[in-house]
C-alpha cells in the first residue's frame, strides 16, 4: 500500500493513497511462515522520494503549509511519526535530498533529532519498490525485524495510528479507516523478500496472494494524501 511523492507518511474526505494499490512489478515465489510475526524491534519508514509533480505550485508539496501560518505537510507527518514512539524513523529521500529538506528551518530542526535517519534512494524515479528496498536494507543493517511504512504526504495519520499498526500481530498489519484499508502498513522481516523487486507498488499484491498473513487494525485519523493543490484546498475548506 504505498505511493510516493517526497515519499517520507487526516481528517479529510479525499482520495485514498495508492501506496499499496499498484498493479505492476513482480512478487517472488517464496512464501513465509506467519509465525513469529510479532515484533518489539520496529522502525518507522517514511517514504519521501517522489517529485510531487502533480502538486502544481512554486514549492514542493511537502513544504506546503496546512494552514497559512501552520506547519508544513512534511513537518506534520514527521512529528506524528516521532510522537508515536514506535522506534527510529527512516526517511527515504529521492527527488529532495538532505540539503533540500534542511533548507526548511523547522524540518532542519527535526532532522537533528537522533531518532530520524535519512536514507537516500538514488533510483527514486524507477518507482516505489526501490525505496522499500532501501528501507528494508537499512532496517536489516540496524537489526530491526519489522517496519511500519507510511508516506510523507499523509499528515493526518495520527501517532496513535502508527502505534496501533506497530502493535499488530500479523506478518502484515494494515490500518483500516471505516473499514477501508490504508496506510500505515507494518511488514515483518519474514515478508520483506516477497515485496516487488521493481515498479511503483507496495504490498497490495502480497496481501491479495496471502490474506492469511494480513491483520487489519482499525485506526482513527485518515490516510488521505495531499497530491494536488486542490487536495490541500479541499482539506483547508473542511
Residues of each region from the PLM?
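Short beta-strand segments
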Residues: 47-49, 92, 150-151, 175-178, ...
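Conserved beta-strand segments of alpha/beta enzyme cores
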Residues: 62, 115-117, 213-215
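Structured catalytic core of nucleotide-sugar glycosyltransferases
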Residues: 43-45, 69, 73-87, 102, ...
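Conserved alpha/beta core of the MobA/IspD/sugar-nucleotide pyrophosphorylase nucleotidyltransferase superfamily
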Residues: 11, 17-40, 198-238
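N-terminal glycine-rich phosphate-binding loop and ensuing alpha1 helix
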Residues: 34, 39-98
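Acidic donor-binding segment of Leloir-type glycosyltransferases
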Residues: 87-91, 95-117
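Acidic, Ala/Val/Gly-enriched low-complexity intrinsically disordered segments
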Residues: 4-6, 10
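Conserved beta-loop-beta/alpha segment of the NTase-like Rossmann-fold superfamily
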Residues: 115-189, 193-196
Amino acid at each position: 500500500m504505498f505511493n510516493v511523492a517526497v515519499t517520507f507518511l487526516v481528517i479529510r474526505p479525499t482520495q485514498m493513497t495508492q501506496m499499496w494499490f499498484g498493479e505492476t512489478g513482480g512478487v517472488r515465489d517464496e512464501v513465509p511462515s506467519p509465525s513469529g510475526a510479532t515484533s518489539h524491534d520496529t522502525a518507522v519508514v517514511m517514504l519521501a522520494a517522489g517529485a510531487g509533480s502533480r502538486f502544481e505550485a512554486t514549492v514542493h508539496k511537502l513544504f506546503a503549509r496546512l494552514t497559512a501560518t501552520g506547519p508544513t505537510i512534511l513537518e506534520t507527518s514527521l512529528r506524528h511519526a516521532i510522537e508515536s514512539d514506535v522506534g527510529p524513523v527512516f526517511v527515504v529521500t529521492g527527488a529532495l535530498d538532505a540539503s533540500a529538506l534542511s533548507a526548511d528551518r523547522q524540518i532542519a530542526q527535526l532532522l537533528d533529532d537522533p531518532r530520524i535517519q535519512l536514507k537516500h534512494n538514488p533510483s527514486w524515479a524507477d518507482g516505489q519498490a526501490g525505496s522499500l528496498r532501501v528501507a528494508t536494507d537499512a532496517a536489516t543493517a540496524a537489526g530491526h525485524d519489522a517496519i511500519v511504512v507510511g508516506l510523507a504526504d499523509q499528515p493526518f495519520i495520527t501517532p496513535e495510528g502508527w502505534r496501533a499498526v506497530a502493535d499488530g500481530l500479523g506478518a502484515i498489519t494494515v490500518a483500516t479507516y471505516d473499514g477501508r484499508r490504508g496506510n500505515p502498513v507494518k511488514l515483518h522481516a519474514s515478508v520483506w523478500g516477497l515485496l516487488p523487486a521493481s515498479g511503483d507498488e507496495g504490498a497490495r499484491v502480497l496481501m491479495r496472494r496471502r490474506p492469511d498473513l494480513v491483520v487489519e487494525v482499525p485506526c482513527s485519523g485518515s490516510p488521505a494524501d495531499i497530491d494536488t493543490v486542490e487536495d490541500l484546498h479541499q482539506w483547508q475548506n473542511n
